[in-house]
Amino acid sequence: MATLQEVVRSVRRKGGVCNESTGIHIHIDFEPYDAQKLRNLVNIFASKEDMLYQALQVNSDREQHYCKKVDKRFLEELNRRKPTDLQTIKRLWYRDDREYHSHYDSSRYRCLNLHPVFTDNNIEVRAFNSCLNAGVLRAYISLVLAVSNQALTQKSASPRVTQSENPRYTFRTWLIRIGLNGQEFKNCRKHLLSHLEGNIA
């Protein structure tokens, strides 16, 4: 992580810039996943998507085109059928039985993108705005790794959307619960909570 942060700082020092038309995509290895754990991951993202979009300030253009929220039909079918094999999840994701789907398949434009699960053996999270702030980038990566760990270690997860009158407190509580606690992740929490309304007390 320290090496990556230094690379980002070096790019910024050399005059690198980013703009609103770009985003950060974070990929995680699919190797430790199975159908149940993948369903956990989908449900965790579905339940926290509204707060995530607020916390990460996903702009409306990206949300409508390149970083769409979970497909409700996919989510409903996934939890109704509770598949035990990846082939079934693949059919639900693409809505067809074709074996091959192109690299630029339209299904890829989701915040939680499962298209690379079936093409490159990884999972992509597309929710993040571009930035050259090393601390913010660390917060993004730490968040994805923590959510992935929750999906892998939790027996089950509900897709029920989290609602709160104090989203800052609720989101902070969740961050701590998934492992972003203590002094080590203090700055990560600061970055991830900075755009949410409410208080942490």
Which residues does each PLM region occupy?
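Short, conserved phosphate-binding/catalytic loop or strand-edge motifs used
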Residues: 20-24, 28
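C-terminal accessory/tail domains of diverse enzymes
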Residues: 1-18, 31-201
